[in-house]
Amino acid sequence: MAVFISSSGSPGRATATTTTTTTLLLAVLAAAAAAGLLLAPVAARGSPPEHDKQLQLQQQEDDRIPGLPGQPNGVAFGMYGGYVTIDDNNGRALYYWFQEADTADPAAAPLVLWLNGGPGCSSIGLGAMQELGPFRVHTNGESLLLNEYAWNKAANILFAESPAGVVFSYSNTSSDLSMGDDKMAQDTYTFLVKWFERFPHYNYREFYIAGESGHFIPQLSQVVYRNRNNSPFINFQGLLVSSGLTNDHEDMIGMFELWWHHGLISDETRDSGLKVCPGTSFMHPTPECTEVWNKALAEQGNINPYTIYTPTCDREPSPYQRRFWAPHGRAAPPPLMLPPYDPCAVFNSINYLNLPEVQTALHANVSGIVEYPWTVCSNTIFDQWGQAADDLLPVYRELIQAGLRVWVYSGDTDSVVPVSSTRRSLAALELPVKTSWYPWYMAPTEREVGGWSVQYEGLTYVSPSGAGHLVPVHRPAQAFLLFKQFLKGEPMPAEEKNDILLPSEKAPFY
């Protein structure tokens, strides 16, 4: 019902007609109000109506995690966890675990989304529990230890289990488990939009996307950037890519080169691999490449490909290893963790996250819809993965052209996505070099090299010394420094020039 009132007459002239009209208007408005037909006042542009604000606050409070089983004392930061529905029709929802910044002024700290790749591996079980999260799982699988180098000491960290089908995240529609790169990026963007609607006070924070996936991170970054003018506003500033496949052709060459240079494969296998594998897909390799790859794995023996110079776990293989071996028909030991050194650390996380009281505290699997035991990676997602880009260089060019902060890093003991692969792929971008390859240190006065770096126009590459595929696992201090430098937009610290000795100035070895 709409009521339109028109009046005539000059201002300041009260007549019987206007008096009657006013009386009639008041009567009509009173009747409309009594019938509930009047609309509420329109809220200010950009501000949700009051009842929406109350709903947001209630959702936040419902997601608040007061504490976790076995949690140590001294935890001063807030935590939230729960589900964000991204498709009502299919019943598709992603799980998240959010940790507020453990800083003097968390309200001023940036927001960082962390994703693990695989595809199909858990950002909670790997990223949060083994790499950069505030806790480490004790060897008893029931209690937690504080992580001295937790990344939430510099930023608010949001871990998301994506896509649906990765452990706690789920869908009521089985076809949703057949994923691909583009669908993954769009689903995760939808998650972000809805998460920001639930936590609107983070909309204008500096926002970054980070993780261990050369596909998920740049592809999601591209979607976020292209939707920069849509609502809600996301203050997207840059991306941090770890150990990521970038260009299948260059990555494949770099892989066989590293295997050979480290004495892991024969001359014949290197030559065969360089002949038949470049140009094939990592996710869907040709039979010819698979045959050579299997020969290479047999020659390597029982090593951990994610960190080739550390001992392997003597327990059953972890699902995480299938990301590397499964396309070629072989399993291998699980990823490692330092410090303290524990080659079977992944099983501590598996035990802890399967405890019913832990899942209850995390607000995970509250309906019991996830019937299978929690595991670090989803074989279903990995085995059914479809569309996978073979070249991410055009995406990088677009993001660099947009002026976003772009950093890439990888460990030098990783044989899965080795330094040689990443450097070849980045070289293919043909970016001008701002600062040539140099050693960096944990502080300008440190004598021991922390790693190496090169700065291009629009992109920075960092290689922490002695790190494997999961850089924060093996070199947590270096990884944390790298993260802080990335957030500040500052290069890795170089040693003062006058502290560097030329070969002629060094003492003899005898």
UniProtKB/Swiss-Prot annotation:
Q: How is it modified after translation?
A: The N-terminus of chain A is blocked.
The residues that hold substrate are: 116-118, 212-213, 465-469
* Residues at the catalytic site: 213, 414, 469
Query: What GO molecular functions are on record for this protein?
Result: hydroxymandelonitrile lyase activity
* Disulfide pairings: 121-377, 277-289, 313-344
Which keywords does UniProt give here? Disulfide bond, Glycoprotein, Lyase, Signal
UniProt similarity note: Belongs to the peptidase S10 family.
| Protein name (record) | P-(S)-hydroxymandelonitrile lyase
Q: Name the source organism.
A: Sorghum bicolor (Sorghum)
The lineage, from the top, is: Eukaryota, Viridiplantae, Streptophyta, Embryophyta, Tracheophyta
